[in-house]
Swiss-Prot record:
Residues 93-102 have a biased composition (Gly residues). InterPro entries: UPF0229 (IPR006698). Residues 62-112 are annotated as: Disordered. It comes from Vibrio cholerae serotype O1 (strain ATCC 39315 / El Tor Inaba N16961). PANTHER family: UPF0229 PROTEIN YEAH. Residues 70-92 have a biased composition (Basic and acidic residues). This is UPF0229 protein VC_1873.
Length: 423
């Protein structure tokens, strides 16, 4: 009786390889769906995956079929109503069967639902932050950020077909066949020598000769039954991620919490910073984040207070920039750290303070920052703070300004600010 041995190493996830191939094949469609999902779901919800939909037309496989037109005769099974030459009336109500669903009629006679499937939390975040990086990251004296690079690392017994090593697999096949047939070949060689001796002997030993020939035939069949290649022989090129020397960095997050920032504007700012925080903590293992909230006064706070504190007041933006400069001087030596800043505000500021903000940025922050991004969240026309900051763009390539008008603008703006230079 035949015995089947399951040597698959994926365990319960026997379709893992197929799933990974599918995600690579429809990468662009999945990225578009994930970008749309960012605006639909709570940005703080990272404990679950996401339902991704792909239009059915994008996943259709190419196929050979008969073209339209021409004269053809077909035999349809089960026909007991028509004979050759009969004409069949068009069904009433259009091309498709009548439906009772609600909604407006369509000009097209047929269609299909999108293909919907679930991606995991890790897959969701990997796709979300793909092709993003901190701009202008440079190596400094002390390296703490752990970045990874893929290297060849020998062979493994499982993997995707594209990584299969033909030479190593054939070597394993030869070794297995040699080990499994060596004893049988040795015994068959001995029997052949015995058969040759018996055939030369007198008188002839017919029965003994037939017995030996039968044993030789059985051994030959057993040797031939050993498969040339088996799944056990397959070897795949193995790749592993190894840490590479990089640089340590600190990101300053400055958020305006003054009275002019209504709840909707604050929510957009928090969503942007949560997205930034997830990106930094997932992409860079040891990057530090400094949270600063400000109204008339600026204060360094922890992560929880930054996102959930209800404190508010007037508006003096320069207080946050001044505090950022003080923290840099006290804790982050310029020769050892890559310094980044991200500032979010609705643009309202005390008129006399806006020139002061421009001066602080141009003299004390931008010359030492790798990158500084200013996000203004407003649907109104820009005020003095925006116009003062605009003067800095001509002088500093490491300074970027973007306007967010609604929740839908958050992710596109975020990608523009942190797109990889070579992506």
């Amino acid at each position: 009786m035949a015995q089947f041995i399951d040597r698959r190493l994926n365990g319960k996830n026997k379709s893992t390889v197929n799933r990974q191939r599918f995600l690579r094949r429809y990468k662009e469609q999945i990225k578009e769906s994930v970008a749309d999902a960012v605006n639909r779901r709570s940005i703080t919800n990272t404990e679950s995956g996401e339902d991704v939909s792909i239009p059915t037309r994008d996943i259709k496989e190419p196929m050979f079929h008969q073209g339209k037109g021409g004269v053809r005769e077909r035999v349809h099974p089960g026909n007991d109503q028509f004979i050759r030459g009969d004409k069949i009336d068009r069904p009433k109500g259009g091309q498709g069967s009548g439906g009772s669903g609600e909604g407006e009629a369509s000009a097209d006679g047929e269609g299909s639902d999108d293909f919907v499937f679930q991606i995991s939390k890790d897959e969701y975040l990997d796709i979300l932050f793909e092709d993003l990086a901190l701009p202008n990251l440079k190596k400094n004296q002390v390296n703490k950020i752990t970045e990874w690079k893929t290297h060849r690392a020998g062979f493994q017994t499982s993997g995707v077909p594209s990584n299969i090593s033909v030479v190593r697999s054939l070597q394993q096949s030869l070794a297995r066949r040699t080990a499994m047939t060596a004893g049988k070949r040795r015994l068959m060689s001995e029997l052949e020598e015995e058969l040759e001796r018996i055939q030369r002997s007198e008188p002839p030993q017919i029965m003994e000769e037939m017995r030996i020939k039968q044993e030789i035939e059985e051994l030959r069949n057993k040797i031939d039954s050993v498969p040339f290649i088996d799944t056990f022989d397959l070897r795949f090129k193995n790749y592993e991620k190894r840490p590479i020397p990089s640089s340590q960095a600190v990101m300053f997050c400055l958020m305006d919490v003054s009275g002019s920032m209504d709840q909707a504007t604050k929510d957009i700012a928090k969503r942007f910073y949560v997205l930034l925080y997830l990106f930094l903590t997932r992409t860079y293992e040891n990057v530090e984040v400094v949270f600063i909230r400000h109204h008339t006064q600026a204060k360094e706070v922890n992560e929880h207070d930054f996102f959930y504190s209800q404190e508010t007041g007037g508006t003096i933006v320069s207080s946050a920039l001044k505090l950022m400069h003080e923290i840099i001087e006290a804790r982050y030596p310029l020769g050892e750290w890559n310094i980044y800043g991200a500032q979010a505000s609705d643009g309202d500021n005390w008129a006399d303070d806006s020139p002061r903000c421009k001066e602080l940025l141009s003299n004390k922050l931008l010359p030492y920052c790798q990158y500084y991004a200013y996000i203004e969240i407003t649907r109104r026309s820009h005020q003095t703070l925006w116009h003062e900051y605009e003067k800095l763009q001509a002088s500093f390539d490491n300074f970027a300004m973007k306007n967010i008008r609604s929740v839908e603008d958050i992710f596109p703006v975020f990608r523009e600010l942190f797109q990889k230079e070579n992506a």
